[in-house]
Amino acid sequence: MNTSKTPSLPHDPNTLLITKHNGIMKTFRVIIAGSRYYCNYRKMVAKCDAILANKLSDPDCKVVIVSGCAQGADALGERYAWRHRLKVERYPADWEGLGKSAGPVRNEQMAQNADALIAFPLYGVANRGTLDMIRRAREHNLLVRVIH
């Protein structure tokens, strides 16, 4: 028996739900990240459209794409934002100033400033940065969807 005041609704687990807070527009920041070798833009569009359907169609929700400014999935995520006329928040890694720690530092900043992650790893190639992003997103209790 559901004793909460919120009614149970059927929910597609591939769709992220949002709530309206006292009639105020909510900004929903979603990181789109993945392998630098990821190049399947059609698949990305189909998956992101399905996952973000409720938010993209809700006039009270402003979706913002968070990008790590890398090649591959990150760049395609920015292209997705452009296609949907969404704002992009860019977090470039400071490779010159931070060296090898630049990627993890950037990933932590993104995880601290987002609500969700849609990750596109490619197995069979190096995915350390993507796996680090997934781990950090989970540590910060972001909604995480990993697309294989």
Spell out what each predicted region is.
Residues 12-24:
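Short, Lys/Arg-enriched N-terminal segments with co-localized hydrophobic residues
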Residues 24-27, 37-148:
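Acidic/glycine-enriched connector segments
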